[in-house]
């Protein structure tokens, strides 16, 4: 049995990034891209490393990136590549947090309206592969309200793959009132790719799309005054 004095591992999975840390800490210890890269060639070695799959930040960001077929491990809030997801969790436990899974309980967030079959698969991997002693899956919207010190309210979660509106009452999500829309950060990336194409710049491969996503995250912002922001952009161009 794991005593209460041993802090739990907290894992937050998302379409763009997955975060992990130790319960009670202010910020996550690890933030990894939710991306898996598989070599386009039969075998591919980067330096002295030879793998069949690269995870998150292990994927090269230089010219070698084009050698990989990139795929998001989580799409629209749902895990679509369980092999890569297992490797990402392994990376978090052993290389980022540097803790043994069997010595810590685990709290893992999940997207609202996650299918029962997906949750069962998640539990199977956590218990059978990582031997975690105790495991709890929590709604991301509920956890967001907890983080703000509230038990009742509406959590609006805008991610990279999906947006959710989650009404919460006394710490419980009202599942029959949850709203979901598959319009999120990914669509902004798609829009930027289209705008780039109109100016003669093509970003068609998965690696090139990641370049556009990186540009979006570093340069785009929400304009509090749209007209003023548009005017300033026209003057600087």
What is each model feature region?
Residues 1-15, 19-30, 37-50, 57-162, ...:
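Nucleotide/phosphate-binding catalytic cleft detector across ATP-hydrolyzing
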